[in-house]
Amino acid sequence: MRNTLLKRMQLALVAMACSCYTLNATVTDYTKGLSIWFDTPNTLQNRAIWYDGRPDLWQGKKKPISAGDTATNPDQSWESQSLPIGNGSIGANIMGSIEAERITFNEKTLWRGGPNTSGGADYYWNVNKQSAHVLDEIRQAFVDGDEKKAALLTRKNFNSEVAYESWAEKPFRFGNFTTMGEFYVETGLSTIGMSEYKRILSLDSALAVVQFKKDGVAYERDYFISYPKNVMVVRFKANKPGKQNLVFSYMPNPVSEGKMEADGTNGLVFKGVLDNNNMEYVVRIQATHKGGTLCNKNGKLSILGADEVVFLITADTDYLINFDPDFKDPKAYVGVNPSETTEAWMKAASAMGYEALFNEHYQDYAALFNRVNLTLNEETATENIPTPQRLKNYRQGKQDFYLEKLYYQFGRYLLIASSRPGNLPANLQGIWHNNVDGPWRVDYHNNINVQMNYWPAASTNLAECTLPLIDFIRTLVKPGEKTAQAYFGARGWTASISGNIFGFTTPLASEDMSWNFNPMAGPWLATHVWDYYDYTRDKKFLKEIGYDLIKSSAQFAVDYLWKKPDGTYTAAPSTSPEHGPIDQGTTFVHAVVREILLNAIDASKVLGVDKKERKQWEEVLAKLAPYKVGRYGQLMEWSKDIDDPKDEHRHVNHLFGLHPGHTLSPVTTPELAKASKIVLEHRGDGATGWSMGWKLNQWARLHDGNHAYKLYGNLLKNGTLDNLWDTHAPFQIDGNFGGTAGVTEMLMQSHMGFIHLLPALPDAWKNGELNGVCAKGNFELNISWKDGELAQVDILSKNGGACEVRYKDVVTTVKTVKGKTYKLAYQNGKLVLQK
């Protein structure tokens, strides 16, 4: 019944999206679906933010090489008022001004830095310090009680010379994700006499829409980015003929050189080269129109008197992902001809027409997004009001279950839009950035942020969206082997705090080891490889790709550890990311080591390989320094009991074993779970957006639904911008994904080897359904509850095998057959298998 209903909804949406796109048709109200929307337009204060309205000032040496590198985005309307669309490769933000549409544009591989700067390949790759020999001296200092010496030796030897800021070295080798420019479509209109304005992002169809009326005319603009065709589609129309008088122009990335040329009678092509590393990029535009005239002159497309205009836009760079880079080749990551790829994409897209492009886009997107549906107390009517007003009301204490559902599904939307197979993973801002440079280089931050991006992927039925992350991990292995050997004398591979698209695995120049010393980056990333297998049970993937990544990461973890004279294994030196001193055994590092070794053991058993190595992993696990409880009853963060109960630091690293790991649990380690709860109570319920997202997951793992719900509310109230983007500040996308993952954790968990139903259901969510979520073991679930208790769960077994299910203290095991659905109802205190 549910699948039939969803199919009808899909068909209705397609019909609604297509049939209404004719002149004089009724305007569709997209706000009635699952949508984020505004009722006031953005003002067009200036053209591209980096020019500050004066492009003549940014010539030659005055180019803004570090513009945007601030904690506060200088373009606040972009950060909190724009609507993001994307297909995993191309991203755009819709501003929705009346006078001119401003669209910021991104292509995920447009990066500065790498081996192809003027410094050459050796300048980029030959940056690891040969520090492994210092480890013995550091560890002896710990034995002697000389912690200052141990810390000094670590600071001086476990960094590099690579700067993290573009202004700090020339050429800038680490690099950063950078804008591909902006598009402007001048309309000749003004806000005078404008009414009924709406700027909408429909999550149901991944379609952005701007609607308004002026002088008796209903105007509409539609925007989407097709994954099948890799093209952005923008349409301008009205309910009266001849109303489209448009001038389309493009402002390229300001730290590049290039040339705009006509591409036929109705198209433009810009071919550019980044100043920093000579990365080539191409932006290709084509316009079609019904009625009126089109003039292609001076790098602009001018349309007069048209009934409807459609712009197609595509882009690419010369970047080619490389799992086996030649460290002597400056062009190791060059291998694509963007002129050819964009020409082929444009040819394919332009042959289809708007309706066919939208239908294909919708079917592709809906096949992913519609897998999961969340209902929260839906019998409660909800007022249809703009999203900023919803947030304002929510902050003032008004309950809004629609907003809570919307935020959950927005996280899934963002993951689909920023991470699709065949490209790179979502970065600190997903795929969206509006400036030359940005906070933390808009990079791949490996001490929680990129990992958090993928917490909701498999559990919310988007496992394939994890594949870009796995490909990214594969790019780190060969460079990471050099880093592991140079700094730790270790086998295997690892990474450090920050990654780019050019295989960077080395620590940066800073001597602040609280953040720059992060050898667990590699093992933490590798746990996602096992998670992908555990959800999908794709044994072919594990054998051909996954196992080697996991095994080599486990080898690094073992070699990194210090076997103390008493036979205990500990991590020295180690840190708790971004917090506290250099230590001889932080809880965080030990928890990550436990996780990757358990993953490696399980993977080797699945494949029936490496019994000898498996035995070593098991022996190290048995002798790894255990969790410790401190004087306040808290789980200790460091090897010494120095935790401060007034410390509200955003990172809760020592609870890694609780979440995202699985070595702490109220079910298996109840005393340590109590100690974990004390940590969370000490840390408080505030902090940055992503931190609240993490704490939400941790409270859910403690089975405290009401406290988890409080964190979810705090995330929405205090860590969310008007367009529902997460903010640190500034905008950081990881909190969105952490929030979505946390809601799933409240309603279903499977990390402990069994399916736990409604483990952290809050009192506020009395009735509801969560359909389509996935559990480890390759099970898909439809869960319903009523009056605060489980009603029924449908379990689709996609792989077969035993399925253990827990609700409250009731446990049952179902022997499943691949492809069959099993229904369990909660009746009279028992889980009853329905026939």
Describe every region a protein language model picked out.
Residues 530-537, 541, 545, 553-563, ...:
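Non-catalytic carbohydrate-binding regions of carbohydrate-active enzymes
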Residues 447-458, 519-530, 588-598, 653-662, ...:
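Well-ordered alpha-helical segments within folded domains of soluble proteins
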Residues 26-513, 531, 551, 564, ...:
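Aromatic-residue-lined binding/catalytic grooves and analogous aromatic/hydrophobic interfacial grooves
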Residues 1-26:
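Bacterial Sec-dependent N-terminal signal peptides
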Residues 507-523, 527, 535, 554:
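Extracellular/periplasmic, surface-exposed regions of secreted and cell-surface proteins
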Residues 552-606:
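Acidic/histidine-rich catalytic neighborhood
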